[in-house]
């Protein structure tokens, strides 16, 4: 048993080092890309700039990311990830209200994903992106299918197993989904573009909320630095269902003030919950 534990620990160390190395390689390549004139940049470097701008989460950076990815595609029409990331950037623009989501725009987004997988059907990143987009469209079965394909190809990428876990919990496969969400949190608690582990923790909170586990939800809530409106609202619902008092709690008072002007119908739609 001790030997098995040692091998498990070694596996975890290797996984975390691999994640760090890949991230380090991308950062080094991105720094070189920033020093190059545009006319000398490769498709891969344009792709990295697009990904970097995507993770800045502003309207201006989103628009710049689209330009970067268009240039990546122009430089190499067989860069599958450039198509997939452009679809992701468009999805971000819809989600954050940077641009209006029309049938035409959604058609373009889906065409980009189809093109990405046509170019390289074995690119796990493309399947991951497809899972993300299907989740945002509330097509949870397709999100699960794409997430499973990506996970089969790369079971140790926290972004991959995270979206797979998100799809699973929305299909009421709670225990299985929790395993993947917990593993993603352990491998990479602070995702790229984030400064805290709040996003991963919010996903775990949702899973335990769906299991109606107040104690575990409270444990996770106390680890979150800035509670998002979904976690806040679901926490209220869970307290109510358990007949627990909460109106004197700091988290409730702070959220009441912070979220008072939100368009709740829009926000709840962004939770991508399964109404069934």
What are these regions (language model features)?
Residues 34-36, 74-81, 114-124, 186-197:
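Flexible helix-coil transition and linker loops at the boundaries of alpha-helical arrays
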Residues 1-64, 68:
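Catalytic-center loop of serine/cysteine hydrolases
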Residues 109-113, 126, 134, 142-276:
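Alpha-helical protein-protein interaction modules
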Residues 61-78, 104-120, 147:
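Amphipathic alpha-helices of TPR/Sel1-like and other helical repeat/solenoid scaffolds
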């Amino acid at each position: 048993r001790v030997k098995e534990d040692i091998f498990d620990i070694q596996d975890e160390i290797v996984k975390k080092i691999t994640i760090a190395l890949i991230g380090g390689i991308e950062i080094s390549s991105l720094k070189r890309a920033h020093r190059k004139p545009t006319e000398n940049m490769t498709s891969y470097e344009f792709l990295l700039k697009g990904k970097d701008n995507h993770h800045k989460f502003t309207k201006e950076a989103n628009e710049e990311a689209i330009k970067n990815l268009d240039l990546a595609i122009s430089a190499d029409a067989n860069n599958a990830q450039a198509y997939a990331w452009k679809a992701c950037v468009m999805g971000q623009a819809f989600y954050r209200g940077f641009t209006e989501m029309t049938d035409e725009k959604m058609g373009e987004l889906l065409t980009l994903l189809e093109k990405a997988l046509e170019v390289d059907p074995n690119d796990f990143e493309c399947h991951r992106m497809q899972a993300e987009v299907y989740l945002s469209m509330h097509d949870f079965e397709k999100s699960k299918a794409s997430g499973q394909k990506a996970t089969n190809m790369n079971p140790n990428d926290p972004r991959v197993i995270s979206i797979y876990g998100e799809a699973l919990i929305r299909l009421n496969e709670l225990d299985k989904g929790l395993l993947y969400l917990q593993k993603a949190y352990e491998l990479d608690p602070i995702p790229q573009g984030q400064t805290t582990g709040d996003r991963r923790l919010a996903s775990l909170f949702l899973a335990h909320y769906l299991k109606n586990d107040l104690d575990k939800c409270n444990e996770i809530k106390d680890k979150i630095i800035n509670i998002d409106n979904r976690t806040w609202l679901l926490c209220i619902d869970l307290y109510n269902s358990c007949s627990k008092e909460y109106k004197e709690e700091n988290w409730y008072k702070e959220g009441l003030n912070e979220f008072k002007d939100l368009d709740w119908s829009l926000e709840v739609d962004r939770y991508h919950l399964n109404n069934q």
